[in-house]
Amino acid sequence: MKKLSLTLLIVFTTVKVSSQNALNYNVVTTAVPMLLVSPDSRAGAMGDVGVASTPDGNSSAWNPAKLAFLENKKASLALSYTPWMSKLVPDIDLAYVNYTKALSDRQGISASLRYFSLGEINFTDDQGNSMGTFNPYEFYFDVAYALKLSDHWSAGTALRSIFSDLTQGISVQGLQTKPGQSGAADLGFYYQGDYNNIKGGRRQAFSAGIAMTNLGAKIAYSESGNADFLPTNLRLGGGYHLEIDDYNKLSVYLDINRLLVPTPPDEENGAIVAGIDGDDLTPLMGVFQSFNPASKPGGFEEMLQENIYNFGMEYKYNDFLFARTGYLHEHKLKGNRQYVTLGFGLAYQVFTIDMAYLIPASPTTRSPLENTLRFSMAFNIDGFLAQ
């Protein structure tokens, strides 16, 4: 059992960090940050790339537009399990299930559910007195649709319902808490080029994608408290695909993504000395302010620091065996996530199994997923029914 102050729980999950230390840390934080965690092991093994990768049963989590390029009439069910902070506590985890189906050679749909359990927590007040044992959790339900605009381009959208129960409705310092609820939408575009012959009997192709995710109403955990931004995110990426021969294929991906929410200002004695207070902005205004250098204490330089870079590679042998690696880089003043990822996959008949493993890039960078093995499994429903 974990023992955790309710105050700390709320601070680390829903409140923006506004103070800065000598190194000028200014991390952009939001509510429900688990919406940004890679739910599947294939992307997790490639440095969390996904907006331009080849379509699979988890495409809607990264770019709903990729659903239009699923194989004609193919339906699949994907399951993923991610232990969270497994080196510290045994009962925090993220579970994910996704159903996808190609309606035709031009349309695709999906429905998915993500469930994040914080395990069993003994809540205490400021004096350390027990307030009871609870099981906080969050779940997100999505539906997505994609349509080909041409032979190479597609567009897709997703709608998302968000439910976050972190406090089980208990009262904190006279403030009655409640579960946070909101809704959000995704919009994405995807390009998939044809393979062209190159020297040595090999062939190459390119892919690209862009997606804005989690654009929706702010979420609040009390009737009188402030509402927090959802983790609205913009992801842009590209992929290069090399078909070495009939059996061997290599894909390389690069994604750039950033949060589309206001940057916390610099404050001294409760007064803003640099940047702006974004608490009163609407989600749409927050999107525009995220690109405004004047709204950030560090100006244009800080705006660039908020970009996160993802690099991934996937080697495929005979559509049967997959080896993957990747790297994620976040600026040291914006969270300092820097880690290498590894993984492999195996496809046999109607089943595909993927695994991912995360290694911190340096002793000074840590992750809740470090040295943790993650699992995903996909089931080809149409292939099973055809047997």
Segments predicted by a language model, with ranges:
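Bacterial Sec-dependent N-terminal signal peptides
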Residues: 1-23, 258
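Subset of outer-membrane beta-barrel
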Residues: 20-387
